[in-house]
A protein has these predicted regions:
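Short polybasic/polar patches that bind polyanions
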Residues: 63, 225, 321
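Glycine-rich phosphate-binding loops that contact phosphosugars or nucleotide phosphates
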Residues: 35-181, 209, 244, 256-298, ...
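Generic C-terminus detector
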Residues: 298-340
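Active-site phosphate/pyrophosphate-binding segments
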Residues: 2-39, 134-252, 262, 324-340
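A broadly tuned, weak detector of single residues within folded domains
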Residues: 1-2, 308
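Composition- and surface-driven signal marking solvent-exposed, interaction-prone regions
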Residues: 219, 266-269, 308, 331
Length: 340
């Protein structure tokens, strides 16, 4: 029997194409407002997988626009009730449901503090959307699996589209148009060597840098949620500042080495951990002592990690079932988590 997660992962290319077609006007309106506001700071508001999406957008904004990005803790508004001075800033809130009270409170507080607010959500009539000046509706359709997949991908797509239009970056816009086809190819990549290794694992590291760091964090979360596997996502630099101390013989490591300026550094870390005895797997690049996993053809350094996320989702759904789990219903979790 096909899981909801498998079906929803398979729907990602169509969902991406649907967003690009139906939400273009929403993106352009928000991008024009961003150009008019010309923010000197951008803050993000999100939790869980949505916060990983926000981390992805942090790197895209900083690398493309040169504007610093900070994640704001929703509890600053929802529990501590501290106003923030955000004049001259923009605020992007990301939430699949748009319902969590802390996210909604922070978006309201950001607007009161002077920020231009943009909501990214699958529900255009949600409280978060209503609390924001602009909304980018994902239009991804129903997502029944507790583990977010297509809404994670389309949330990043929405943000990258916004940033590309804000900066009027033709190369990135052209790459975005080709994403649905690249995502379709990613669904069929063979990561079975990694599946065989993680089928019996208890712990793992997932590494990346730049936008791929956010995908590493998301991959580690999905390994916990759907596979009952204790995994941690790290920057391929940060892992050397302490966490690598526990990497010994046969410790599994997945390194996401997309084609960007950081690739050689990710490969160098992978080789160092392999030399410590780790079982290292690297996407899209060769590393001494490591197993290379296939990657989809490169489009643009700022979208290639998103394509890698699609390949990972297809992989982790099968790994979940291989380990005897139901990927749709992780223990102790619900689809919509509302926190203060």
């Amino acid at each position: 029997m096909t899981s909801h997660m498998a079906r929803e992962v398979a729907e990602i290319p169509t969902a991406a194409a649907q967003f690009l077609k139906l939400s273009a006007g929403d993106v352009q309106a928000a991008a024009e407002a961003m150009r008019q506001a010309d923010p000197s700071l951008l803050v993000t508001v999100a939790r869980g997988s949505s916060d990983h999406a926000a981390t992805y957008l942090k790197y895209v904004v900083e690398l493309l626009a040169g504007v610093p990005v900070a994640s704001v803790g929703p509890s600053v508004a929802s529990i501590y009730r501290r106003p923030l001075r955000l004049g001259g800033a923009a605020c992007i809130g990301i939430s699949q449901s748009g319902q969590s009270p802390d996210i909604v409170e922070m978006m309201l507080a950001a607007g009161r503090g002077g920020a231009l607010t943009v909501a990214v959500t699958n529900f255009a009539d949600s409280p978060m959307a209503q609390a924001s000046a602009f909304c980018l509706p994902l239009r991804a359709g129903a997502e029944q699996s507790v583990a977010a997949t297509k809404t994670f991908v389309t949330s990043i797509l929405a943000g990258v589209c916004l940033i590309a239009h804000w900066q009027q970056d033709t190369a990135l816009l052209n790459a975005i148009d080709r994403l649905p086809d690249a995502m379709e190819k990613a669904l069929h990549l063979d990561w079975s060597p990694l599946s065989a290794r993680l089928s019996r694992a208890q712990s793992a590291y997932v590494l990346g840098r730049g936008p791929a760091f956010s995908i590493a964090a998301e991959a580690a979360l999905k390994l916990k949620e759907t596979c009952g596997l204790h995994a941690e996502g790290y920057s391929a630099a940060e892992v050397l500042h302490g966490p690598s101390a526990i990497v010994q013989a046969q410790f599994p490591v997945l390194a996401l080495a997309v084609e960007d300026a950081a690739q050689t550094h990710v490969v160098a870390t992978a080789e160092r951990l392999a030399a410590q005895g780790a079982d290292v797997f690297v996407t899209g690049a060769a590393a001494a002592g490591a197993t290379t996993l296939p990657a989809a053809p490169a489009l643009h350094p700022l979208v290639d990690p998103l394509v890698t996320a699609v390949a990972f989702y297809a992989f982790v759904e099968t790994l979940s079932r291989r380990r005897g789990y139901d990927p749709d219903t992780p223990p102790h979790l619900r689809k919509v988590t509302e926190t203060l």
